[in-house]
């Protein structure tokens, strides 16, 4: 299985002929090296509705026929656009052709902002994902603050790889992410959601060094760099 980081919180997964995209944000990210029209997708997993996590979801889904997996409200909204969707909600699990997806809680918000109309439409709760693929467990926290129930995930799942936001301001920062990593006890932690904008500039190398200091492994992936599980 190959997992590739594309900047912000965007991750693609290739496994047994299946292509999964988490939080596609390519066209709006100046640092992105991949164009949305070049993305292969069978399933698109959305943690929430903010533009920096789903900006390219509609275009990719239309081009590929991919099924979008999201919370009930967000999935229903996207179904009105004629897209294939699979609605879920917090705590629910479903087995897809590529593996199991469990939707986890996240402490954040979820909305679609139309600046032209000056409207904000809330889209249900934000989420994270616990994926079980090829007997490996991957946790994508989405956008979230630190919360104590992360310890439950660490206790009940043998997490091989965790994608944790470190940008601060909108999500937990490096210090809280270190606490999260300790609770999750993932074998490897990859920082995400940083450096895309000035408000979330962080030193990912320093974060990984601090992970090492607390006995854990961190890996700050470059844009379009992959990791094999």
Curated annotation (Swiss-Prot):
InterPro entries noted in UniProt: Metallo-B-lactamas (IPR001279), RibonucZ/Hydroxyglut_hydro (IPR036866), UPF0173 (IPR022877), UPF0173_UPF0282_UlaG_hydrolase (IPR050114)
Protein name: UPF0173 metal-dependent hydrolase Exig_1934
Keywords (A to Z) from UniProt: Hydrolase
Coiled coil in keyword set: no
HAMAP family according to UniProt: UPF0173
Gene3D superfamilies: Ribonuclease Z/Hydroxyacylglutathione hydrolase-like
Top-level lineage group: Bacteria
UniProt similarity note: Belongs to the UPF0173 family.
Gene Ontology molecular functions: hydrolase activity
Organism taxonomic ancestry: Bacteria, Bacillati, Bacillota, Bacilli, Bacillales
């Amino acid at each position: 299985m190959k997992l590739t980081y594309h900047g912000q919180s965007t991750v693609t997964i290739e496994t047994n002929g299946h292509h999964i995209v988490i939080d596609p944000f390519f066209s709006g990210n100046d640092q992105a090296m991949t164009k949305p029209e070049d993305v292969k997708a069978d399933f698109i997993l959305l943690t929430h509705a903010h533009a920096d996590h789903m900006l390219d979801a509609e275009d990719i889904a239309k081009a590929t026929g991919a099924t979008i997996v999201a919370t009930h409200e967000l999935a229903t909204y996207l179904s009105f656009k004629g897209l294939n969707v699979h609605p879920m909600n917090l705590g629910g699990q479903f087995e897809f052709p590529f593996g199991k997806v469990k939707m986890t809680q996240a402490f954040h918000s979820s909305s679609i902002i139309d600046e032209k109309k000056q409207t904000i439409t809330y889209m249900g709760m934000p989420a994270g994902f616990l994926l079980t693929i090829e007997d490996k467990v991957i946790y994508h926290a989405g956008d979230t603050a630190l919360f104590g129930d992360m310890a439950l995930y660490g206790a009940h799942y043998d997490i091989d790889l965790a994608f944790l936001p470190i940008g601060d301001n909108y999500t937990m920062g490096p210090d809280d992410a270190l606490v999260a990593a300790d609770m999750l006890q993932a074998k490897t932690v990859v920082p995400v959601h940083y450096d895309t904008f000035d408000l979330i500039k962080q030193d990912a190398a320093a974060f990984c060094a601090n992970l090492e200091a607390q006995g854990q492994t961190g890996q700050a992936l470059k844009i379009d760099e992959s990791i094999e599980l």
